[in-house]
């Protein structure tokens, strides 16, 4: 495998992956507030920003407070994604001071699609299927809820909104063992960039270690290559990161979601 310039990968990520892709999901709106993009209408508000927000001190505090107060008025939570190399470096402390709570950091990994693409190898009795119908999306949400022990019912509406806006912008896969979903995952294509985001990879505990997550990576990488995309992006959990590294992905930074939840 050829040496990879991780600095160049990071530069591509910063240039191309800071903002959401292509078509806006049904029911969602994008609003600009100075340097940041406010994503409104999903199950939770989201803030996306360039590497350098471009404001500091009291001005930054006011920017943060406006986002919190905007979503508080809607009775909704909001998340702000911060990468380890972002500026200003005190943004996390200022988010916490405004009432945001950090989640566990994820490792941002990039892979070269052509190197990762392969024929997916599945255990006996497991079938890989592409889905887009509402009933299948509800099953995916139930599967995610079961695995993570959290209410993931919003996943069905989120996926349906993306499919309804532009079905070519997302590929949703399920690995089925009989009438059970053993693993679920999807790809979000970023038109006009080199990137496909690999999302949602979730496997039932008793199916882990049997190659389903690897098969999902391989299948999605193959389609990325077929569609002309060069790079794969994952915000990886501690469980997923080692698998992705073995598949040739490269760490470029970490990302942390800072969550604000309205008082009850």
Task: Name each region found by the language model.
Residues 1-70, 87, 154:
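N-terminal charged segments
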Residues 58-136, 234, 240, 256-260:
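Acyl-donor-binding surface of acyltransferase catalytic domains
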Residues 29-34, 87-101, 169-185:
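Conserved beta-hairpin
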Residues 95, 244, 249:
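Conserved active-site tyrosine of GNAT-family acetyltransferases
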Residues 60-68, 199-205, 209-222, 226, ...:
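Conserved acetyl-CoA-binding loop-helix of GNAT-fold acetyltransferases
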Residues 152-206:
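A conserved beta-strand-loop-helix scaffold within acyl/acetyltransferase catalytic domains
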Residues 41-50, 103, 189-198, 208:
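A conserved beta-turn-beta hairpin within the catalytic core of GNAT-like acetyltransferases
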Residues 1-19, 52, 57, 106-109, ...:
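Short amphipathic alpha-helix that is part of the acyltransferase structural core
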């Amino acid at each position: 495998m050829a040496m990879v310039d991780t600095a160049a990968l990071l530069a591509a990520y910063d240039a191309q992956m800071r903002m959401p892709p292509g078509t806006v999901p049904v029911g969602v709106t994008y609003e600009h507030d100075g340097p940041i993009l406010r994503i409104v209408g999903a199950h939770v508000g989201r803030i996306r920003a360039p590497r350098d927000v471009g404001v500091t001190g009291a001005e930054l505090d006011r920017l943060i407070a406006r986002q919190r107060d905007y979503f508080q008025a809607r009775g909704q939570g909001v998340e702000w994604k911060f990468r380890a190399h972002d500026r200003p470096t005190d943004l996390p402390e200022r988010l916490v001071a405004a009432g945001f709570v950090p989640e566990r950091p994820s490792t941002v990994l990039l892979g070269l699609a052509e190197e990762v693409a392969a024929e997916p190898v599945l255990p006996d009795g497991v079938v890989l299927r592409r889905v887009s119908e509402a009933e299948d999306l509800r099953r995916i949400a139930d599967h995610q809820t079961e695995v993570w022990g959290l209410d993931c019912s919003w996943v069905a509406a989120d996926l349906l909104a993306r499919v309804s806006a532009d079905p070519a912008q997302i590929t949703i896969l399920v690995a089925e063992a009989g009438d059970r979903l053993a693993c679920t995952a999807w790809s979000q294509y970023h038109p006009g960039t080199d990137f496909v985001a690999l999302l949602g990879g979730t496997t039932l505990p008793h199916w882990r270690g049997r190659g389903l997550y690897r098969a999902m990576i391989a299948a999605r990488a193959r389609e990325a290559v077929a569609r002309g995309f060069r790079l794969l992006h994952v915000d990886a959990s501690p469980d997923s990161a080692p698998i992705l590294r073995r598949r040739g992905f490269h760490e470029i930074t970490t990302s942390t979601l800072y969550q604000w939840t309205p008082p009850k």
